[in-house]
Amino acid sequence: MKQERTRVVIVGAGPNGMTAAHYMGLYGIDCVVLELADGILPYPRAVGMDDEALRVLQGIGIAELAARDMISNVPLRYYNARGVCFAEVKPSTAHYGWPMRNIFMQQLLEGTLREQLVNYPCVELRQGHEMLELEQDADTVTLLVRDAQGEVYRLQADYVVGADGGRSSVRKQLGIELLGLTHPRKWVVVDTANDTLDAPYTALHADPQRPFVCIYLPYRQRRWEFMLLEGEDEAGMCEETTIRNLIRGHIGDAVDQLQIIRIRAYTHNSRVAARFVQGRVALVGDAAHISPPWAGQGLNSGLRDVANVVWKLAAIIQGRACASIFSSYDQERRGHATDLIALADNMGAVLGLTNPLMAGVRDWLFQAVNSVDNLRSHLLEFKFKPKATITKGLVYHERAQLHEDDLVGQLFVQPDIEDPLGQRRRLDEVLGRSYSILGYRVNPAEYLSEEMTAYWARWETQFIQINRSRSGAGRHQPLSAPGILSIEDVDNRLGEWFSNVRDCIVVVRPDRFVAAITTPERLDGVLRKLAEQLS
């Protein structure tokens, strides 16, 4: 039997698996991606992407390309049985450099990811290859794989990432249980083309007679989702005639122009794997956690998983960090993934009421919320979405008692800045692929001991001094600091961020989470604590 060896194997070539593969390529790590299917499924699946997920794609140079097939700043609206909008989510902020609500079609994103993989000769995508078995010891993971011609071979790797969806073969091979519940009501999902409906938003129609969803998609496509009521026959409800009659009730004869792409009944699950990491194998995306669609966070959670695990893999394989940091992925991601599933459950509960009395109470409550400015803003700006916050893991909290305003462990902001050449850029474009240490109006590199300077140089750490906008002697004489990168805070958003913390130096991880906040005098000691965590 043929035997091969690589550094990382990724099982599954969906958006999560391919994004992880791009990061492996970016870090120069040999990687094989195994995908059972021969090609990309030609219809939409995931359709919502947020600012955090786009920032992950930005890290591999894909965000701008993917955005060409997206509709940005799409509102989310709840309607009652009378067709009156009783709640709206319409964020106007861009804390992380991208719009918060974007509509896309998964097959187009997958196409972009696969097209751009040619930039990384160290990464190989193998379509039509099925993982049959997985075993691991202290040093190696061994996979038994069947190729597209039916030949079986062994593939060994240092690490494996299971990105193979809700029915994950990797998870099953590891014997990891998927904990949670399966929701009793099924939904019929209908993807259509040649759409002419003038409704450029995502509409959740909370009609107790039959809750349904209507999602505006790119390129004249639209998704409809209808709840199956108690006693209804699934097969009969999935017939095209039945579906056209349901849609006709909402758009009239315009339904005759629609092309039906796909009709499928779905059972929604709210489940989380008992472990995200076992030995040298990590589960990401739906392989680790499955969410109902109502918060639009399923794929976004998966991309957060990828961002968390890939830099750790790279650091271990390249000898910068000890292998024990691999397990921190579970510690840092499980809580937030679980919180977002709870959010989806709650949003689905608001939508799915079939008791008219309860639906009336809900409508009244939201009417009351909308009459209070602060509460209405809370809805509009999607402030009720749980923030990813790392309280334990590869971060260092100087305060013994954590506070709500502690920004350590949260995602760092991404405003526009000006580089030394006067070019306006997103912040991440100058942070690099590794750790970054930024000082607000101070040079952080001046406060490191020789030992810490040498240690963080091995990480290719980027040292940056942030200056107020136009604080130099002239347009061609920006303020600079010797030996480090100086940038200008052109929109004063970094100044605003630092005004909310006590200190003027921030340490940012490769995944753009804040590892520590400190003062120049304490910086060397803080970096020593972080180094201890890594090594």
Enumerate the language-model features and the residues they cover.
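Core beta-strand elements of the Rossmann-like FAD/NAD(P) dinucleotide-binding domain
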Residues: 4-6, 150-159
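Internal hydrophobic alpha-helix adjacent to the cofactor/substrate pocket in enzyme cavities
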Residues: 303-323
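A conserved short coil-to-beta-strand element within the FAD-binding core of flavoproteins
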Residues: 127-141
